[in-house]
């Protein structure tokens, strides 16, 4: 019985150490904005998009721009 409690405490400790949004939803199929940007041929840039590209959105959580040629 003590082993069960020990394992339960260890699992709770491991989950409490994770940062919010560590990838629980991403691993279930939800994709990040950065992933979507890259999949659609864009690239993430912290400054404004170059003149030969256009703004497609953001690459959260840092909110850099998603630029596409």
UniProtKB/Swiss-Prot annotation:
UniProt keyword terms in alphabetical order: Antibiotic, Antimicrobial, Defensin, Disulfide bond, Membrane, Secreted, Signal
Disulfide cross-links: 37-66, 44-59, 49-67
GO MF terms held by the record: CCR6 chemokine receptor binding; identical protein binding
Localization of this protein: Secreted; Membrane
Cleaved signal peptide residues: 1-21
Expression sites by tissue: Detected in kidney.
Recorded GO CC terms: extracellular space; membrane; microvesicle; sperm midpiece
Record GO biological process: calcium-mediated signaling; defense response to bacterium; defense response to Gram-negative bacterium; defense response to Gram-positive bacterium; innate immune response; positive regulation of flagellated sperm motility involved in capacitation; response to bacterium; response to testosterone
InterPro entries noted in UniProt: Defensin_beta-like
Annotated propeptide span(s): 22-32
Free-text function comment from the UniProt entry: Has bactericidal activity. May act as a ligand for C-C chemokine receptor CCR6. Positively regulates the sperm motility and bactericidal activity in a CCR6-dependent manner. Binds to CCR6 and triggers Ca2+ mobilization in the sperm which is important for its motility.
Complex formation: Monomer. Homodimer.
Family: Belongs to the beta-defensin family.
Name of the protein: Beta-defensin 1
Species name: Mus musculus
């Amino acid at each position: 019985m003590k082993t069960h409690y020990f394992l339960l405490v260890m699992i709770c400790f491991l989950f409490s150490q994770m940062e919010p949004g560590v990838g629980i939803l991403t691993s279930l199929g939800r994709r990040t904005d950065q992933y979507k940007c890259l999949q659609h041929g864009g690239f993430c840039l912290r400054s404004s998009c170059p003149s030969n590209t256009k703004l497609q959105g953001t690459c959260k959580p840092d909110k850099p721009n998603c630029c596409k040629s």
